[in-house]
Swiss-Prot record:
Residues 32-50, 99-100, 155-161, 227-244, 294-296, 353-360 are periplasmic. Keywords: Cell inner membrane, Cell membrane, Membrane, Transmembrane, Transmembrane helix. Its main location: membrane. It comes from Escherichia coli O157:H7. The lineage of its organism: Bacteria, Pseudomonadati, Pseudomonadota, Gammaproteobacteria, Enterobacterales. Belongs to the major facilitator superfamily. TsgA family. Pfam families: MFS_1. This is Protein TsgA. GO terms for cellular component: plasma membrane.
């Protein structure tokens, strides 16, 4: 693979995460405007965004098999066509059914692109370099999560219609589409070059189960936590502005942590540092949940920084459980994380209704403790060390 080709594929991976981050995180900014547009209460409007999450989940799950049937370049180019249709649907339709369909299509495009982006990084890089590259790729999710809400605020403050926010997000996919030209993608399944040697089927092992549970609990815990921090902070007497600042600080610290750990991870065994970070994150979340408002800003900054590398390291370790990175395995771990996203309000909504926001935060804390236990148990069964030894010779 030529260096310029590798750079193009790496940028496609970066932008695939930016696309998903923009679509998922901008929701809170535009929901009120969309509710007014359709003359609906915000509470019923929020349910239609489940179509976005469902599209992401279904496409990540199915793409484990689709990757071996449909070439990656074809998928990305077809995704561009779907993106144009979805944004056009949002712009020219006043029907809630068509809005929901467009959201589902955006989710499908986003999920397919993100699963391809993840696979490209696991395919191009090995060992500890794979972990640091995946982490840097994941930081584009947070970066888009910071940039696009600012773009949305800028547009909405000038009374520009909400759908132009999605048109701006569509420009990320335009960049991906342009990068596919003159770029060679790894061939998979029936498109892969034929070899005389039979392909050995590798068993995944119990380590993949531990990592999948950790991925689900981590994302469910993280989103369950950050979704209810503003309500919890307001309950302690903080202003809405200060509560929002807590969330912004978390994501800013998370992004800085990703950049720092993309360098730091190269010097440590991934399973060991993952266990330490998961334990630290559980402790810092407990400090936030039980601390005074005066200390909340510092504890959430520390939590964002030290938890930033957890999810990507889980995916990296998953890809290292087999000698050759398996798209099915990587997508399985990703799917488990996406299920965590889907379950966020299903799990935390009733808890908040019965016991208040702090109970949801303590539930998230318990989920982080489960992540720590899974990472600790992984140390006894993980195959990443033997595969790293093989690839380094």
């Amino acid at each position: 693979m030529t260096n310029s080709n590798r750079i193009k594929l790496t940028w496609i991976s970066f932008l695939s995460y930016a696309l998903t981050g923009a679509l998922v995180i901008v929701t809170g900014m535009v929901m009120g405007n969309i509710a007014d547009y359709f003359n609906l209460p915000v509470s019923s409007m929020s349910n239609t965004f489940t179509f976005l999450n469902a599209g992401i989940l279904i496409s990540i799950f199915l793409n484990a098999w689709l990757m071996e049937i449909v070439p990656l370049k074809t998928q990305l180019r077809f995704g561009f066509l779907l993106m144009v249709l979805a944004v056009a649907g949002l712009m020219f339709s006043h029907s809630l059914a068509l809005f929901s369909a467009a959201m589902f299509i955006l989710g499908v495009v986003s999920g397919i692109t993100m699963s391809i982006g993840t696979f490209l990084v696991t395919q191009m890089y090995e060992g500890r370099q794979r972990g640091s590259r995946l982490l840097f790729t994941d930081s584009f999710f947070s970066m888009a999560g910071m940039i696009f809400p600012m773009i949305a605020a800028f547009l909405l403050a000038r009374s520009i219609e909400w759908y132009w926010v999605y048109a701006c997000i569509g420009l990320v996919y335009v960049a991906i589409f342009i990068l596919t030209f003159g770029c060679e993608f790894p061939a998979l399944g029936k498109h892969a070059p034929k070899t005389d040697a039979p392909v050995a089927k590798e068993k995944w092992g119990i380590g993949v189960l531990f990592l999948s549970v950790a991925a689900l609990c981590y994302i469910l815990g993280q989103l369950g936590f950050i979704s209810w921090v503003p309500e919890y902070a307001k309950g302690l007497g903080m202003s809405l502005n200060d509560a929002g600042t807590l969330v912004s600080n978390f994501w800013m610290s998370y992004m800085v942590g990703m950049w720092a750990f993309s360098f730091i991870l190269r010097f440590f065994d991934l399973q060991r540092i993952l266990t330490v970070l998961a334990g630290l994150a559980a402790i810092l979340m407990y400090v936030f949940n039980t601390g005074t408002p005066a200390h909340m800003a510092w504890s959430i900054l520390a939590l964002g920084f030290f938890s930033s590398a957890i999810y990507t390291t889980i995916i990296t370790l998953g890809s290292q459980q087999t000698k050759v990175p398996s798209p099915k395995l990587v997508n399985f771990v990703l799917t488990c994380g996406t299920i965590g996203t889907m379950l966020t309000f299903v799990v935390t909504g009733p808890i908040v209704e019965h016991s208040g926001p702090q109970a949801a935060l303590l539930t998230a804390n318990g989920l982080y403790a489960v992540v720590f236990v899974m990472c600790f148990l992984l140390g006894f069964v993980s195959r990443h060390r033997q595969h790293n030894t093989l690839t380094s010779h």
